[in-house]
Amino acid sequence: MTEHTDFELLELATPYALNAVSDDERADIDRRVAAAPSPVAAAFNDEVRAVRETMAVVSAATTAEPPAHLRTAILDATKPEVRRQSRWRTAAFASAAAIAVGLGAFGLGVLTRPSPPPTVAEQVLTAPDVRTVSRPLGAGTATVVFSRDRNTGLLVMNNVAPPSRGTVYQMWLLGGAKGPRSAGTMGTAAVTPSTTATLTDLGASTALAFTVEPGTGSPQPTGTILAELPLG
């Protein structure tokens, strides 16, 4: 029997979180998580929670449900006889993207008129190289779903306290020849229990970092890095 690695187990967190596994596969994953070293099990559970929180926020803007045959077709691609680890993540995110962008509009006659351009969420979530990473940020979590192919990411912050008045959270793209690049700011009013933002032009950046900066932000980081999410 091929030995399972910790990396392979963590790769299964996304399809597990999105219910893109069978009952037998879910039971097997549960057994592996229970037997895994505590840091690995904690990392698995953190990613499952982050993916579910992220998709809940991204999909909250629509109440449309995708047609049943679409989800069936997507999940058929993850059957054991044809599945590969790299395809699990793509298929699972494709299923989630269908919910997030409201593909249930097919039932409303969208096929009779030109399709709207894909949203940023759709572009990222359906990318072949989509990845997700999550880290604590204060008492909450910050999650980035990103695609190098699309050069774009989606940031979701859950249960992060707003910055103090007169300051902002500032996001920084780290790495690359130009050093830290500002990826935007969030003031007190912009931070809610579930906050989303789009990250564009990821370029050669290797991480997304957060600092607290005075006023409306700084040209370069001046505060302590509160969280750093790898984008490798």
Curated annotation (Swiss-Prot):
Q: Which residues lie on this side of the membrane: Extracellular?
A: 112-232
Give the membrane topology.
Single-pass membrane protein
Q: Which residues carry this modification: N-acetylthreonine?
A: T2
The record places the following residue ranges in the Cytoplasmic compartment, namely 2-90
Cellular location(s) = Cell membrane
Sorted alphabetically, which keywords does the UniProt record give?
Acetylation, Cell membrane, Membrane, Transcription, Transcription regulation, Transmembrane, Transmembrane helix
Which residue ranges does UniProt annotate as crossing the membrane?
91-111
Q: Which InterPro entries does this one have?
A: Anti-sigma-K/W_factor, Anti_sigma_zinc_sf, RskA_C, RskA_N
Ranges in coiled-coil conformation: none
Q: Name one GO molecular function term.
A: sigma factor antagonist activity
Stored Pfam families:
RskA_C, RskA_N
One Gene Ontology cellular component annotation? plasma membrane
Task: Give GO BP annotations, semicolon-separated.
Answer: regulation of translation
What role does it play?
A: An anti-sigma factor for extracytoplasmic function (ECF) sigma factor SigK. ECF sigma factors are held in an inactive form by an anti-sigma factor until released by regulated intramembrane proteolysis (RIP). RIP occurs when an extracytoplasmic signal triggers a concerted proteolytic cascade to transmit information and elicit cellular responses.
**Similarity field:** Belongs to the anti-sigma-K factor family.
What is the UniProt domain comment for this protein? The cytosolic domain interacts with sigma factor SigK.
Q: What is this protein called?
A: Anti-sigma-K factor RskA
